[in-house]
From Swiss-Prot:
A single GO molecular function term of this UniProt record: serine-type endopeptidase activity
Catalytic residues as annotated in Swiss-Prot or TrEMBL: 101, 126
Reaction catalysis annotation: Hydrolysis of proteins to small peptides in the presence of ATP and magnesium. alpha-casein is the usual test substrate. In the absence of ATP, only oligopeptides shorter than five residues are hydrolyzed (such as succinyl-Leu-Tyr-|-NHMec, and Leu-Tyr-Leu-|-Tyr-Trp, in which cleavage of the -Tyr-|-Leu- and -Tyr-|-Trp bonds also occurs)
Protein name in UniProt: ATP-dependent Clp protease proteolytic subunit 3
InterPro entries cross-referenced by the UniProt entry: ClpP, ClpP/crotonase-like_dom_sf, ClpP/TepA, ClpP_His_AS, ClpP_Ser_AS
Amino acid sequence: MPIGTPSVPYRLPGSQMERWVDIYTRLGVERILFLGSEVNDGIANSLVAQMLYLDSEDSSKPIYLYINSPGGSVTAGLAIYDTIQYVKSEVVTICVGLAASMGAFLLAAGTKGKRVALPHSRIMIHQPLGGTSRRQASDIEIEAREILRMKDMLNHSLADMSGQTFEKIEKDTDRDYFLSAEEAMAYGLIDRVISHPTEA
């Protein structure tokens, strides 16, 4: 039985009255964002808007992006990635559970020195996926060229973010490549493994 989005009490600054807001709204007040699903256009638009708002409110404070995601759309993920790079605020990325595919890419995209994972997190990198349902050969060829272009761009970005060579990234992402939190740190996808929020 689904429980829905939990609500929590929140007191507006300067007010004596509390009101109930959904947990994500309350976390957003503390500059905490959560990517807890597959990456799609709706999720990306929401995260981009929240990051832009928080950055415009106070770019001297970090934004915390918690990630527990199986990945998803490359183009939607790149919108989030570009925004992480665009905002002046430091973006602390924190893996809780699983950061796979585009989730792992976004984890590695956080501010250097501020990319962390909890001890039992799993991180997985691989090449972008594409599908071909009954379509004309010319359309399949166009899609294949675009997937290869994205694969090359993502691998170059992962190499930059991790410090690994492009060749190693290309080899490792040829198939699903799973890492523990400690292995992801040694690989350069994250900077630290943490077990307490004050360590982030």
